[in-house]
């Protein structure tokens, strides 16, 4: 599931107008190799290809490094960020982008609806910026709990994809999501992702007691 050099070769060969990447990947949670990502950025800059990079989950990884320093030398780089992911504010829908392409920003501004960021979302965003210690605490929990959750899933016989993020991709019995829903637990079925089929799911890495509740429900659902 890791992005490889064949992708770099494909970009060089096909020369698309734009490249869209997600770092870390969703739904695998794997970070793109920094060297490879730098080469992709260099190639896109050389060929005049826009590079759109989703970094919405990057702040919740321990090893992830933003491409923000490359904005200075790559006008075609476009970074996507979100308070909703880093601070758990999904219902408020607050995100932003970073780019040197002012012409593109003006075009985007002309197409967006007026008042596209609500007052509650603005207030929550300002408050979140003051919570500098929160992200580190969140990362500490994720780094501690992710290997435990992955090991528990493997112990149930599920295939688990290595992850650097706050979620795990695993394969198990089909219909597992519906079984868990009946006991009040939601996991993300991933059959609609390219290359995945029924039986692939994504789960969040949460607090210890919540992860234990998930594993207990999975154990019962799988008859283990």
Predicted regions, residues:
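PLP-dependent enzyme catalytic core of the Aspartate aminotransferase-like
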Residues: 182-183, 192-224
């Amino acid at each position: 599931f890791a992005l490889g050099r064949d992708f770099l070769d494909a970009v060089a060969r096909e020369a698309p107008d734009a490249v869209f990447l997600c770092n870390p990947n969703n739904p695998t949670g794997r970070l793109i190799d920094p060297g490879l990502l730098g080469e992709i950025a260099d190639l896109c800059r050389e060929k005049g290809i826009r590079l759109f990079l989703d970094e919405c989950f990057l702040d919740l990884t321990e090893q992830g490094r933003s491409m923000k320093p490359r904005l200075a030398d790559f006008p075609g780089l476009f970074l996507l960020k979100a308070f909703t992911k880093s601070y758990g504010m999904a219902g408020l829908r607050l995100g932003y982008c970073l780019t040197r392409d002012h012409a593109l920003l003006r075009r985007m501004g002309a197409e967006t609806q007026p008042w596209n960021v609500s007052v509650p979302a603005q207030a929550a965003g300002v408050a979140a910026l003051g919570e500098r210690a929160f992200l580190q605490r969140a990362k500490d929990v994720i780094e501690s709990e992710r290997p435990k959750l992955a090991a528990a899933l493997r112990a149930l016989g599920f295939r688990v994809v290595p992850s650097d993020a706050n979620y795990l991709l695993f394969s198990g019995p089909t219909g597992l999501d519906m079984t868990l829903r009946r006991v009040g637990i939601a996991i993300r079925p991933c059959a609609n992702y390219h290359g995945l089929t029924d039986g692939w799911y994504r789960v969040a890495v949460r607090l210890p007691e919540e992860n234990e509740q998930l594993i207990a429900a999975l154990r019962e659902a799988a008859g283990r």
